[in-house]
Amino acid sequence: MPKLVIHQEKVEDPQVLVDICPFGAMEEKDGKLSINAACKMCKLCVKKGPAGAVEYVEDEKKEEIDKSQWNGIAVYVDHVDGEIHPVTYELIGKARELASKINHPVYALFMGNNISDKAEELLHYGVDKVFVYDFPELARFKIESYTSVFEDFIKKHQPCAILTGATTVGRQLAPRVAARMKTGLTADCTILEMDENTDLSQIRPAFGGNIMAHILTPNNRPQMATVRYKVMNAPERTEETHGEIISCAIDKEKIKAHVDVLDIVKKEPEKFIESADVLVVAGRGIKKEEDLAMIRELAELLDGQVACTRPLAEAGWVEAKCQVGLSGRTVRPKPVSYTHLRAHETCADL
């Protein structure tokens, strides 16, 4: 990426540049200037600072990759002890749609221990190849081991794009893999579209849901995106299977971790609004926190759950995990009761 270079010999008074920067990114120590992480690359120091003191250096043009060498849309299989998270099936459905536009196969990456007998289920949803890494070392999620397996899969099979569920595991794993492969990652995508040249258009809300950002990774592979549960539609399960299951080998040294899982304490079962059939949604029209009591009473009468729009979550009146909309959770309840919403409030993901 581009960078700013300070030519110390041309800086007569460091304080001049310190004062120019509106973000406090210029630091002076022992008569020398440095740039910290607050820099926004606005280039004011280049334009208004002493001539030649700060230089903006563009990246050297990266050699274009051969996109034809990257083939297939891969889905990471999110599971706990072999029980596959439903977001996986939703992503398989989207992967099939994307793959059909460029005539690519659909892959599933399944890693864990004693999971081989669960892999066939994925074939009932239209996966062409399930790559299974079944080892005792992968019995519990360890970020080092899982990242190494992911890297091994990518280097051997070179998928064009990888879709991962935005779950607790997926949110940890996908960024590590993207950094390891030096590629881009778009989190919490709501729309995915495939171009004929195999570029994946990744669309997601930005700036609190006020705009939709369109993101491309044109000269890096694989292209990576995470998607929340219930954003995409899962395909129908079929009785027939046409794909194949491939047992993968890997050097045991690569999946050794420096962290051991000593014990697992399971949380008490918790209700999530994503799985609720009935929701009562409160918004900015609620003027006092005390007024939420009648909202909760209504939800209880309907055997449903309480949800809210962004203002109530930001006020701390309702937990953030109960927020719906572009900047909240994606839900698909049957009936939805909206109470006290202002005209400009929307729940676009409902």
Where are these regions (language model features)?
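N-terminal glycine-rich FAD/FM-binding segment characteristic of electron-transfer flavoproteins
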Residues: M1-R342
